[in-house]
Amino acid sequence: GFLWVTGGDRHRGICPQDNSLLCGVVLRVDGNGNAHPDNNAPRADKRIYTYGHRNVQGIDFDPATGRAYTAEHGPWHNDEVTALVNGGNGGWDPAEKRGGRTACPDKYCGYEPNQKDGMIPAIRAAYTPMSDTRFTDLMKPAWNNNGYSQGTGSAAFLTGSNWGIYEGRLAAGIMGIAFGGTPGGLRIDMYDIDADGQSIKSVVHMPLGMEKRFRGLRMDNGMLYAST
């Protein structure tokens, strides 16, 4: 078996797209910390499986295919669920003076333009996109949060016949960050993802009868454990 490790961009603008830095990445390593021999990211560090990430909070594996899926925080827009591709690029590039941007505080454009009540999410998202289509190796997200960032957390595939029509769906906890005109949304979402991992058929809010910041999800013997 191999260990998968997710890492954020550390508020360094050049990190996610830089070829030499170990941040904004997903690693696949063995028990000694060595790279999986099939890792294919175009990086100097062969432990890297994918790069170009902002803040991956959840990762789990489709029980039918073994494919890895991540749940990731957006900055102030577009939380995402993405099917990982070996060597693929998440498309996050918060560096200044790229993509038509000028200088940014701390040389980090991830929070620009600044959060403002009533700002149209699409306008904010266009300035520093979560999945920038400039990159030819972009991994297209299966789902984004309609332009909002509400704090997508841990993720787990639902397994067991007791889940009925929801068996095989990916569940993700939403921590409900509500400010600057963003709706709250403390919940667990269940995504019915297309077989190609490029889109979803539907998303359903799990009827829990309560609102909590769901930080961790884990499946065990057909039961979903959720930590708050």
Label each region the model flagged.
Residues H205-G209:
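Short loop/turn motifs that cap or connect beta-strands within the blades
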Residues W4, D9-V204, G222, S227:
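Beta-propeller domain segments
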